[in-house]
Amino acid sequence: MSILSFLLGEKKKSASVAKERLQLIIAHERVGGRPPADYLPALQKELVAVISKYVHISDDDIRVSLERQDDLEVLEVKIEIPQA
């Protein structure tokens, strides 16, 4: 965040905030943090809350999973958005 944006009070966009949160979760997981079962349900609820601001969805419309294969981790988020 630059000094100018701090002084003018510009807010971060929700996409950049979500990206930062995901980066923190992944970094925490890589250094031996808590198991993925702890934060995945909370992440799913937050995603529902954010997306619900723009589109009507339910908890069942979002699925979050973390798969590990050797040294590769894949965070998969599937979102079903109803057609207008």
UniProtKB/Swiss-Prot annotation:
Lineage: Bacteria, Pseudomonadati, Pseudomonadota, Betaproteobacteria, Burkholderiales
Family according to the record: Belongs to the MinE family.
Name of the coding gene: minE
A Pfam family assignment: MinE
InterPro entries named in the record: MinE, MinE_sf
Organism: Burkholderia cenocepacia (strain HI2424)
GO BP field: cell division; regulation of division septum assembly
Function: Prevents the cell division inhibition by proteins MinC and MinD at internal division sites while permitting inhibition at polar sites. This ensures cell division at the proper site by restricting the formation of a division septum at the midpoint of the long axis of the cell.
Protein name in UniProt: Cell division topological specificity factor
Annotated signal peptide: none
NCBIfam families: minE (TIGR01215), PRK00296.1 (NF001422), PRK13989.1 (NF010595)
Domain of life from the UniProt record: Bacteria
Keywords linked to the UniProt accession: Cell cycle, Cell division
